[in-house]
Swiss-Prot record:
Phenotype of null mutants: Plants are overall smaller with a reduced number of flowers and siliques and display a glucose-insensitive phenotype which allows them to grow on high glucose concentration medium (>6% glucose).
Protein name: Hexokinase-2
Residues annotated for ADP binding in this entry: G104, T105, N106, T253, G441
Residues annotated for D-glucose binding in this entry: T194, K195, N229, D230, N256, E284, E315
Transmembrane segments: 4-24
Pathway: Carbohydrate metabolism; hexose metabolism; Carbohydrate degradation; glycolysis; D-glyceraldehyde 3-phosphate and glycerone phosphate from D-glucose: step 1/4
CDD domains on file: ASKHA_NBD_HK_plant (cd24020)
Cystine pairings recorded for this chain: none
Lineage of source species: Eukaryota, Viridiplantae, Streptophyta, Embryophyta, Tracheophyta
Membrane topology type: Single-pass membrane protein
EC annotation from Swiss-Prot or TrEMBL: 2.7.1.1
Gene3D superfamilies recorded: 3.30.420.40, 3.40.367.20
Biological process terms in GO annotation: glycolytic process; hexokinase-dependent signaling; hexose metabolic process; intracellular glucose homeostasis; programmed cell death; sugar mediated signaling pathway
Amino acid sequence: MGKVAVATTVVCSVAVCAAAALIVRRRMKSAGKWARVIEILKAFEEDCATPIAKLRQVADAMTVEMHAGLASEGGSKLKMLISYVDNLPSGDETGFFYALDLGGTNFRVMRVLLGGKHDRVVKREFKEESIPPHLMTGKSHELFDFIVDVLAKFVATEGEDFHLPPGRQRELGFTFSFPVKQLSLSSGTLINWTKGFSIDDTVDKDVVGELVKAMERVGLDMLVAALVNDTIGTLAGGRYTNPDVVVAVILGTGTNAAYVERAHAIPKWHGLLPKSGEMVINMEWGNFRSSHLPLTEYDHSLDVDSLNPGEQILEKIISGMYLGEILRRVLLKMAEEAAFFGDIVPPKLKIPFIIRTPNMSAMHSDTSPDLKVVGSKLKDILEVQTSSLKMRKVVISLCNIIASRGARLSAAGIYGILKKIGRDATKDGEAQKSVIAMDGGLFEHYTQFSESMKSSLKELLGDEVSESVEVILSNDGSGVGAALLAASHSQYLELEDDSETS
């Protein structure tokens, strides 16, 4: 009996030791995997680093590319497009004007009543309409007929407040946020469609001409006074309310910048210098690239997998379209190489663009003790049923790295523009007031991003100069801005000037 007891005891001891060894091995394996997670995190943080010296290099490279793009067509990755807008709104504009804003799957028609310096925008009315999917890939005349049908019905609802003097033609500003080769203030040919549109017979056609032909088909008498993109609309809207606005930046799904340049500083401009001495330049800065940009393996793979490899490099690391996708790619590597979400990689994590930037922003903004929002988003988006607090903290760290890099590079770009136009220092000992008008959901709604961008710009400018540089949110520039540009370039301005002087 004693031998049986001893044997049983020995067997139990062996079993306990084996179980303990298994637990130890699992813990060691788990610790090894977690060490790999931290290793991936630290490497990513180092690759994304944006010390102030690097930001200055990026800003200097931006300035060099701006000079090159202004010198000749195709001389730079920055297109530096001449907009033909040489007269931004001053606030003195009066009358009522229309705007048409086409930049995606929705479009808007708008009318604004302007009351001059004191009354400003007296009244505005608008209608928004979705474009049926079949029109996004159909024929050019079908799309423009649909748009003009909505516009004509909107015109028919003018109330008594919107009174057109006898003999005057309605005037419209057309915001068209697709790549265009501008031919004049009110004409430009489509280079290519983006954002899900694919209408072959519009490419290389004057988009204003297509719009006017559609108007003529329904008997709508309206002059297209200005063709602009959303960034120039934002600049116009900002200048209308603040005469010190010199730069506009869109930070939304995509990104772009426009600014006021001295006309004599544009070597590729061969026309007569405008009376104002100024010209608005549409930079198309999303296409900026430089060896100084801190690019990672995830950025390179995202670029290779994109529809336009090698293009829009800056946009792919700072805009709302891509920030969430960068996060997904880092999490996927952690899941595959370090079992971050357990032994099985969540199938949803393999779907490109499943993590949208608004979701990333919501997680980044989570201040609850247990990071409840992060856990909820991981469950809702990736179907990760459980996540530990330390996992959630890693996700927060990744959000912070990605957003901080994007925000600081945006600030470097703005600083580069200010350097180009001599607004990065005091002039004759005096500070020049410079205002940057911002628009776009990324800047407006992702607080950590916008705050980081503003503080980084201040860091680059220094305390003294930053006192005279202001960053403001200029909502709805793409709508109101186009109407304001129609007003500031109205065909009736010279008649009004003549009547005032006579």
